[in-house]
Amino acid sequence: MLFPEDQVAFCERCFHSTPCWCCHLPCGPLHRRLSDERIVCQHCYSTALLSPSQLGPLYEGTIRFFQNQMKMRLKNRPRLKVTDQRYLLREFEITDHTFGLYTNSLEEETIFIITGIAEDRAWITLAHELTHFWQKRNCPNPQALVLVEGFAEWTVYKLAEHHGLERAMLSMRRNVAEPYHTELHALLGLEQKLGVQGVVHLARTKAGLN
């Protein structure tokens, strides 16, 4: 059984094995069960980030990307907290496949990241949630949800492009979930006409694309 776009192949037995929670490909006979019962494949586990000290350099790298490549300045930053899925399910009633979450309370703002996700997934999760932090300070309120989420996904795509995360870019292009899919492709099209800073300016000034 072939997954040509992912450049991997599986025998029939492995093809029908448990899918990896992180990449969704079959785990095969080798897999790891995390503390909160999620099952991940050996490939994802080999780059899994399990502690704040491992995620810290990626967080700093994401902030540098925002400021240097995207010109999206951050005067301050939210707290970064690594937790397991059970905590987010209990405290925030997230969906089963949420990799991260940005929360805004009167006391503090926090980006939660699920422990045990692969490095490329951690990059894009950090970028998506950090975009929401930036949007709160720089974009119209209210702003259409499709533009809020579409711009966050577009920013993630630019980070993946910058770091050469080809599989992440492919996954985003073929993701049909809304409100991410349509607006991501719309903003990629607008980028060809307006450039990167033109899209950032649109997000800063418009309540929606219509």
Give, region by region, the residue ranges found by the protein language model.
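N-terminal low-structure segments adjacent to metalloprotease catalytic domains
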Residues: 1-60, 64, 68
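Pan-zinc metallopeptidase signature
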Residues: 12-25, 29-32, 36, 177-210
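Auxiliary, metal-adjacent structural segments of Zn-dependent hydrolase domains
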Residues: 49-109
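Hydrophobic (often cysteine-bearing) scaffold residues that line and stabilize catalytic clefts
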Residues: 55-58, 123, 127, 144, ...
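Active-site recognition of the HExxH zinc-binding catalytic motif
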Residues: 66, 124-137, 149-153
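Short pre-active-site segment immediately N-terminal to the catalytic Zn-binding motif
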Residues: 106-126, 139-144
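Preference for well-ordered, secondary-structure-rich cores of eukaryotic proteins
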Residues: 113, 135, 194-195
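Post-HExxH zinc-binding segment in Zn-dependent metallohydrolases
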Residues: 138-181
